[in-house]
Regions:
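Cytosolic-facing regulatory segments adjacent to core modules
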Residues: 72, 81-82, 88-136
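Phosphate-binding loop that captures ATP/GTP phosphates
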Residues: 33-34, 42-91
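Conserved catalytic-core segment of NTP-binding enzymes
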Residues: 113-215, 220-221
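Conserved Rossmann-like nucleotide-cofactor binding loop
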Residues: 42, 97, 161
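Short, well-ordered alpha-helices that flank and scaffold nucleotide-derived cofactor binding pockets
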Residues: 25, 29, 48, 147, ...
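Walker A/P-loop phosphate-binding motif and the immediately C-terminal alpha-helix
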Residues: 2-42
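C-terminal boundary of histidine-terminating zinc-finger modules
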Residues: 223-239
Length: 265
């Protein structure tokens, strides 16, 4: 069974793409087959972290949206490219061409697009997880992605605007009947050590905090040099994100069982 997950944040600069890329690799290390989709179509950047060049992407999501290629043309298997010993990672990237970005902003795309892509990946590539890396904020694209996904992972920094925005985002997702979990990212080290932080924040934002990622300067400086966890598997960041990956597997497995039992009645 394929689980679709949206990685989202209320504001930009919270580390969505960094988290998505590293999370995908860690899920693969746990034996999962993962597809990551750069749905930040107006400002794509996930390919940079994966070290995927424009020459490697013969076609993009933009081409598929406008019927210029087949679905198989836009799915890039980067398992060997990343030298992963287990699992699999597929990448679907967006165009960096200005004219393509302008076109999709002006014309948009079908509201069924997200679900269609997830279903194709499930049927043709047998993936365990489809992860959408979205554009920050509350906009039509985000809501379409949320409506098409099983679970949302909200990244939040520890400042007032982010806390308020994450609470609002979570409440909107609840109205759509969608489950959301929160990861606190770039948390000041002294604050991250507080054992009460997850429960205190959970009460404020009315959502479960499933992980804390302290701020590390080296994460920022490494962004354009590849997936951090692959180069630094023993780093505390990698260890913490691995715990989040395992927790996500537990949570989505529980949700799947609940759905199956409900459907069986």
């Amino acid at each position: 069974m394929t689980t679709t997950c949206v990685v989202h944040s209320y504001r930009g600069g919270t580390g969505k793409s960094t988290t998505t890329s590293n999370l995908s690799v860690l899920l693969a290390a746990l034996g999962k087959r993962v597809a990551t989709i750069d749905m930040d179509i107006t400002s794509p950047g996930l390919h940079v972290i994966y070290n995927v060049s424009s020459q490697m992407m013969n076609f993009t999501l933009n081409d598929y949206i406008y019927n210029r290629c087949s679905f198989q043309d836009i799915v890039l298997d980067i398992t060997n490219h990343l030298k992963l010993p287990r699992g699999a990672v597929y990448f679907l990237g967006s165009s960096m061409k200005p004219e393509e970005i302008v076109k999709v902003i002006r014309e948009g795309y079908s509201d069924k697009f997200f679900r269609h892509v997830a279903e194709k990946l499930s049927q043709e590539y047998n993936v365990d997880y489809v992860i959408f890396d979205t554009h920050p904020g509350l906009n039509e694209d985000t809501l379409l992605a949320v409506m098409s996904s099983d679970v949302s992972l909200l990244l939040m920094r520890m400042d007032k605007q982010d806390v308020t925005g994450t609470y609002i985002t979570g409440q909107i997702m609840k109205k759509f009947g969608r489950i959301s979990y929160v990861v606190l990212n770039m948390v000041p080290p002294n604050l991250a050590e507080s054992p009460d932080l997850p429960s205190e924040v959970s009460k404020i934002i009315d959502a479960s905090v499933i992980g804390i990622l302290p701020f590390y300067e080296e994460i920022l400086s490494h962004r354009s040099r590849g997936v951090f966890c692959l180069h630094h598997p023993q780093h505390p960041y990698s260890s913490q994100l691995l715990k989040i990956a395992k927790r996500l597997i537990e949570l989505t497995a529980t949700e799947s069982q609940t759905i199956d039992l409900t459907g069986a009645k």
